Amino acid sequence: MNVKAIAKQMPITPRKTRLVADLIRGKNIKEAQAILMFTPKSASPIVLKLLKSAIANATNNFSLDDKNLYVKEIFVNEGLRLTRLFPRAKG
């Protein structure tokens, strides 16, 4: 059974987040949590929060035991960009 958790519009670049996501792909849940806790990257708390959300979804919504869970798939896509306007004379 596949359990899903989604995080949208995170305030960090996808390139930095992909580095952390590659570390836990295919790992056991406990091993992935340990890796994320001790990784000194700025994206690791965001990915750890998302992983905990996926674990909570599995245990509460689907009544699955968290000892048998692993990270099957994790991917990072680019979100919306902030458009900034600088009001000044342009000519």
From Swiss-Prot:
Q: Which residues form the signal peptide?
A: none
Q: Which InterPro entries match?
A: Ribosomal_uL22, Ribosomal_uL22_bac/chlpt-type, Ribosomal_uL22_bac/org-type, Ribosomal_uL22_sf
Q: Name one GO molecular function term.
A: rRNA binding
Q: Which GO terms describe its biological process?
A: translation
SUPFAM superfamilies documented for this protein: Ribosomal protein L22
Q: Which GO terms describe its cellular component?
A: cytosolic large ribosomal subunit
Keywords attached to this Swiss-Prot or TrEMBL record, sorted alphabetically, are: Ribonucleoprotein, Ribosomal protein, RNA-binding, rRNA-binding
Its transmembrane ranges are none
Q: Which Pfam families match?
A: Ribosomal_L22
Quote the function comment for this protein: This protein binds specifically to 23S rRNA; its binding is stimulated by other ribosomal proteins, e.g. L4, L17, and L20. It is important during the early stages of 50S assembly. It makes multiple contacts with different domains of the 23S rRNA in the assembled 50S subunit and ribosome.
Q: How does it assemble?
A: Part of the 50S ribosomal subunit.
Which family would the database say this protein is a member of? Belongs to the universal ribosomal protein uL22 family.
Instruction: Fetch the PANTHER family from UniProt.
Output: CHLOROPLAST 50S RIBOSOMAL PROTEIN L22-RELATED, LARGE RIBOSOMAL SUBUNIT PROTEIN UL22M
Protein name in UniProt: Large ribosomal subunit protein uL22
- Give the organism, scientific name: Pigeon pea witches'-broom phytoplasma
